[in-house]
C-alpha cells in the first residue's frame, strides 16, 4: 500500500486545481492500481473538496499554519522532526492532522502548476511542505520566476525533493541553473490527460443547463479571468473589460457566438471569474448572441464545452491546456511567463508569439489578429497526442520511484 499526499491545493472550485487533482488521481490509479493506494488531499477548501473528490480520496485535510511560513527552512525541519517524535508519544494529539498525514506518507505530490513562483506572493507558505522529511515529487511544475529571497529559500529546501518534472522549457533551464542536482525532466502538464465530457453531453450543458441554443452557430470560447486583476496591479480594469467586450462585438459581427467560461469560481470574489464574465457580457452590443456558462460544471465539463469551439481565447492556464490537449486552436492572454513558455513549447516560438500576448497589451484589434492567426494555423491533434504522452511520463516516474 502506497500512501500519497497531494498538497498545495487551493481547492476544486478553482477548476484549474480540480483539473490537476483529477488528472493526478487518475494517473496514479492507472499506473499503480487503485487497490494499492491511499490518497489524501491537503486543500484550502476541505469541505467542498471532501465531497467533490470523495470517490477517489481516503482523506482530506486543511493545511496547518504550523510551522510559520516566515521561519527559516532549518527551523521548519526541526519543527517537523519534533512532530514526528511526538507522533510516537501521547503528545501526538497536539500534532496537526495534516502534518501527521504528511509525515506518514510514502510520497508527497506538491501540486499547483505554478504554486512555486513568486507571482502570488505566497511562496514561503507553500514551500513548507518541502521540509517535512517525506520524499516530495514536484510534478509538471512551472517554477519561478522567484525573488531573490524566495530563490534562496527554494535552494535551501531541496534535500527531500525526490522527483522534479517541469511542464515547459524555461523552467527546465531555470532549475538546471539554480538547482541542477534536482535533475529536472521536461514532461507536460498533467491536465493534458484530463478526460473531456462527451460532446453530446457538453452540448446539452450549453443548451439545456445554460439555455443557449447552439444550432449551427460557430462557437468561440473565451475564458475571462477575474484573478489576474489582483496579481497584476498594472492592468487597467475598465480597459480590460471594455476591450474584451469590443472583441466579442467584433466576433459577433463576423458570425461568431462566444461562450464565456468562468473557469475559477472561488468563494473569494477577487478570484471568481463569474464577475469578470458578467461585466463583459453586460457591455457587449448583442448579449443574446453569446452566453456566460453559469451552471455548475466540472473541469471535464468545461473541457468538453471547449471541444465544441473552433477557437479558445484564454486568460486561464488550464482552459488553454483543455483546448490544446484536444488540438483546438488557442490564443493565450498571459499574466505571467507560464503562458508564453507553455505556448512556445507547444506551437513553437514563431506561432506562439503571434497568438500570445501580455494582458497589459490587450486591445480588440490584437485579440482579433491573434484569433485569426490561431484559426488559420489550424487544429493540432498530433501535437496534442505528443503532449499527452509526455504527461504520462509524470506517473511513470512516480511508479519507478515508489518501486525502487
Model-found features: residue ranges?
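Active-site anion-handling motifs in enzyme catalytic cores
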Residues: 1-404
Amino acid at each position: 500500500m502506497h500512501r500519497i499526499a497531494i498538497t498545495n491545493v487551493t481547492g476544486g472550485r478553482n477548476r484549474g486545481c480540480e483539473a490537476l487533482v483529477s488528472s493526478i488521481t487518475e494517473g496514479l490509479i492507472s499506473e499503480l492500481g487503485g487497490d494499492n493506494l491511499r490518497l489524501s488531499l491537503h486543500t484550502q477548501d476541505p469541505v467542498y473538496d471532501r465531497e467533490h473528490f470523495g470517490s477517489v480520496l481516503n482523506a482530506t485535510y486543511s493545511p496547518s499554519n504550523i510551522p510559520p511560513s516566515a521561519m527559516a527552512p532549518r527551523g521548519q525541519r526541526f519543527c517537523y522532526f519534533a512532530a514526528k517524535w511526538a507522533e510516537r508519544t501521547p503528545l501526538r494529539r497536539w500534532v496537526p492532522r495534516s502534518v501527521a498525514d504528511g509525515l506518514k506518507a510514502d510520497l508527497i505530490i506538491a501540486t499547483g502548476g505554478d504554486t512555486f513562483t513568486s507571482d502570488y506572493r505566497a511562496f514561503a507558505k507553500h514551500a513548507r511542505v518541502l521540509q517535512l522529511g517525506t520524499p516530495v515529487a514536484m510534478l509538471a511544475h512551472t517554477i519561478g520566476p522567484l525573488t531573490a529571497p524566495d530563490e534562496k529559500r527554494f535552494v535551501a529546501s531541496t534535500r527531500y525533493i525526490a522527483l522534479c518534472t517541469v511542464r515547459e522549457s524555461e523552467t527546465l533551464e531555470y532549475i538546471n541553473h539554480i538547482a541542477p542536482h534536482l535533475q529536472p525532466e521536461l514532461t507536460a502538464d498533467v491536465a493534458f490527460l484530463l478526460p473531456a465530457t462527451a460532446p453530446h453531453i457538453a452540448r446539452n450543458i450549453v443548451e439545456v443547463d445554460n439555455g443557449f441554443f447552439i444550432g449551427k452557430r460557430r462557437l468561440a470560447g473565451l475564458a475571462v479571468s477575474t484573478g489576474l486583476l489582483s496579481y497584476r496591479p498594472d492592468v487597467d480594469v475598465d480597459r480590460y473589460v471594455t476591450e474584451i467586450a469590443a472583441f466579442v462585438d467584433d466576433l459577433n459581427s463576423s458570425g461568431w457566438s462566444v461562450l464565456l467560461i468562468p473557469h475559477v469560481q472561488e468563494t473569494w470574489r477577487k478570484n471568481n471569474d463569474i464577475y469578470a464574465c458578467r461585466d463583459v457580457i453586460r457591455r457587449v452590443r448583442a448579449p443574446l448572441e453569446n452566453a456566460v456558462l453559469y451552471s455548475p460544471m466540472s473541469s471535464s465539463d468545461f473541457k468538453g464545452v471547449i471541444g465544441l469551439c473552433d477557437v479558445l481565447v484564454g486568460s486561464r492556464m488550464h482552459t488553454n491546456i483543455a483546448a490544446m490537449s484536444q488540438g483546438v486552436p488557442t490564443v493565450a492572454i498571459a499574466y505571467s511567463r507560464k503562458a508564453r513558455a507553455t505556448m512556445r513549447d507547444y506551437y513553437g516560438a514563431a506561432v506562439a508569439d503571434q497568438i500570445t500576448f501580455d494582458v497589459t497589451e490587450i486591445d480588440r484589434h490584437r485579440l482579433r489578429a491573434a484569433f485569426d492567426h490561431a484559426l488559420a494555423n489550424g487544429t493540432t491533434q498530433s501535437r496534442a497526442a505528443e503532449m499527452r504522452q509526455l504527461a504520462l511520463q509524470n506517473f511513470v516516474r512516480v511508479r519507478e520511484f515508489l518501486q525502487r
